């Protein structure tokens, strides 16, 4: 059977070809739109969380004998941040699965992550939801490390992200999500059910673990940058 006969008997792949090519063109756009989504919701997410104490908007209801009061502003901010986390995962997963990594994604994906994560962390720390000293560790680490990466890049030295930095980000995300959803019950009788060690583990431990990974990854990155810059200078 020649290819013409095969095409006449089984025309399905031929008819599907235009659809396949169109879908291939949209692959990069889908991942990029997920990045754009995070950029656009960063500001409203930060505002809802930052104005939690000022707005004080509550939703009151009862479940049996338990009276529940929800901080709506914090809850909305937490929900928006959770959608950002999901979009970040889908963005990376689809880009790898479809081999659809774009220059736009390389530039704006890490920027979107840093803006929304650091912005929300600042808002939470100012409102007293975790210790301000941990925020200083996170911000100083990112600023110094980004400056060193830029300097190394000018010397044609590229330092790839490692698992320590990824776990730092994961712990920050976990801490933010738990803070928003758990602290939204702070004026409720149900908050007493979550008090003590369990309450601390949910709302504080992730930040301390993130601080450990921040310092650890900072040291590792410094060693890698120093070694590669030393190798680069030795070739001059």
Swiss-Prot record:
Key word Transmembrane helix present: yes
PROSITE patterns (alphabetical): CDP_ALCOHOL_P_TRANSF (PS00379)
InterPro entries: CDP-alcohol_PTase-I, CDP-OH_P_trans, CDP-OH_PTrfase_TM_dom, CDP_ALCOHOL_P_TRANSF_CS, Phosphatidylglycerol_P_synth
Keyword Glycosyltransferase in record: no
Chief subcellular location: membrane
Cellular localization per UniProt: Cell membrane
UniProt enzyme class: transferase
Pfam families (UniProt xref): CDP-OH_P_transf
GO molecular function, one term: CDP-diacylglycerol-glycerol-3-phosphate 3-phosphatidyltransferase activity
Keywords tagged on the record: Cell membrane, Lipid biosynthesis, Lipid metabolism, Membrane, Phospholipid biosynthesis, Phospholipid metabolism, Transferase, Transmembrane, Transmembrane helix
Record field: transmembrane: 39-59, 66-86, 120-140, 163-183, 196-216
Reaction equation(s) it catalyzes: a CDP-1,2-diacyl-sn-glycerol + sn-glycerol 3-phosphate = a 1,2-diacyl-sn-glycero-3-phospho-(1'-sn-glycero-3'-phosphate) + CMP + H(+)
Membrane topology: Multi-pass membrane protein
Annotated EC: 2.7.8.5
Pathway stated in the Swiss-Prot or TrEMBL entry: Phospholipid metabolism; phosphatidylglycerol biosynthesis; phosphatidylglycerol from CDP-diacylglycerol: step 1/2
GO biological process, one term: glycerophospholipid biosynthetic process
GO CC terms, sorted: plasma membrane
Highest taxon, organism lineage: Bacteria
Family annotation (NCBIfam families): pgsA (TIGR00560)
Protein purpose: This protein catalyzes the committed step to the synthesis of the acidic phospholipids.
Family as reported in the entry's similarity comment: Belongs to the CDP-alcohol phosphatidyltransferase class-I family.
Protein name: CDP-diacylglycerol--glycerol-3-phosphate 3-phosphatidyltransferase
UniProt organism field: Mycoplasma genitalium (strain ATCC 33530 / DSM 19775 / NCTC 10195 / G37) (Mycoplasmoides genitalium)
This protein's encoding gene: pgsA
